[in-house]
């Protein structure tokens, strides 16, 4: 699976709605942390990496898929993402910094 990581990153690099995207590893467990501008960007990403995701799911399983977004964006994702069985979390206002103050 780890060998597919750079391919995922390259495919994702030019997506205009992608805010951040990276993999981290702990032994044989991979974590992909990604953020998108809106639901449409999430769906565009899934379409863009669909072939790679199919390859990845042949050799690995999704242990947990969390989607954190405003409730209005979650509603746009429920049906299209149903086959991935995500957990949805309604995001409340908070703080987000681009860099340290």
Please place each PLM-identified region on the residue numbering.
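Short, flexible active-site-adjacent loop segments at beta-strand->alpha-helix junctions, enriched
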Residues: 27, 71-73, 95
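Repeat-unit-sized solenoid/scaffold elements
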Residues: 21, 63-65, 97-101
């Amino acid at each position: 699976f780890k060998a597919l990581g750079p391919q995922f990153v390259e495919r994702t690099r030019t997506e205009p709605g992608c805010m951040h995207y990276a993999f981290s590893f702990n032994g044989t467990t991979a974590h992909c942390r990604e953020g998108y501008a809106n639901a449409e960007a999430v769906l565009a990403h899934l379409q863009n990496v669909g072939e790679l995701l199919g390859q990845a799911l042949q050799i690995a399983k999704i242990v947990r898929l969390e989607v954190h977004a405003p409730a209005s964006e979650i509603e746009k994702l429920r049906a299209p993402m149903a086959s991935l069985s995500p957990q949805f979390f309604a995001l409340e206002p908070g703080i987000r910094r681009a860099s340290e103050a």
